[in-house]
Amino acid sequence: EPGNMAYLDFAGSTYSGSLKPFMMARCINIRKALELLPVPQNVSGEAVLLITDRFLPLNNGLLKITAQNGALTQASTIENEEITMDSAAFTQLYFGTFSFEELVRAEKIKVHNPQKSGFLQALFNKCRNYINEYY
């Protein structure tokens, strides 16, 4: 079926295909990554994200992100979460490996407020990454 991303969970299976990426990424500081995210001028909105990170507690927390006039601000908040994801899903979203909707369908992101989906879809674009390494 088109869009079926079940293969993302098959890494430990004996009878499945395997993915062998040549590059891996991880957002070490999610708050700083959000500060550096380029935002299109026409994207505006806000959402409260609950980010969880099993390995780096610095990244755990509720963040309210606001985009307007080509800038993104983020701040810790005590508001109810509207979107929940772990650091792995955030990294895939941030680098454009998968779109917001693809990660929702794969159950990597949980949406508590569907009205925020359009904003996050516009903020994080799926793209092809070209990585150059120079030694």
Outline where the language-model segments fall:
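Intrinsically disordered, low-complexity, positively biased terminal segments
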Residues: E1-Y135
